[in-house]
Amino acid sequence: MSSGGLLLLLGLLTLPAELTPISGQDRPIKPGLCPPRPQKPPCVKECKNDRSCPREQKCCRYGCIYECRDPIFVK
């Protein structure tokens, strides 16, 4: 295999690692989506990632606001 082909293969294998979701940068990621943005003062940080939230709640980011919210599920 040529060096160009090897680099392409390596790039394709590492692509999924680059596509991490915004909500909860650290794993595990919990199922569901974050509900619409709450009305709160700017830049409140109640959580860092999904693991810092209780039960099934997700750490949801709305601009500079991070808060634990119950997930919503879309069909």
Curated annotation (Swiss-Prot):
Annotated WAP domain residues: 27-72
GO molecular function, one term: serine-type endopeptidase inhibitor activity
Function, as annotated: Damages membranes of susceptible bacteria. Has no hemolytic activity. Not toxic to mice. Does not inhibit the proteinases elastase and cathepsin G.
Organism of derivation: Cryptophis nigrescens
Protein keywords: Antibiotic, Antimicrobial, Disulfide bond, Secreted, Signal
Gene3D superfamilies: Elafin-like
Lineage: Eukaryota, Metazoa, Chordata, Craniata, Vertebrata
Signal peptide region: 1-24
Tissues with expression: Expressed by the venom gland.
Main localization category: secreted
Descriptive protein name: Nigwaprin-b
GO cellular component: extracellular region; extracellular space
Compartments it resides in: Secreted
Family assignment from sequence similarity: Belongs to the venom waprin family.
Disulfide bonds: 34-60, 43-64, 47-59, 53-68
Keyword Secreted belongs to the record: yes
GO BP terms: antibacterial humoral response; innate immune response; venom-mediated disruption of cell wall in another organism
InterPro entries: Elafin-like_sf (IPR036645), WAP_dom (IPR008197), WAP_four-disulfide_core (IPR050514)
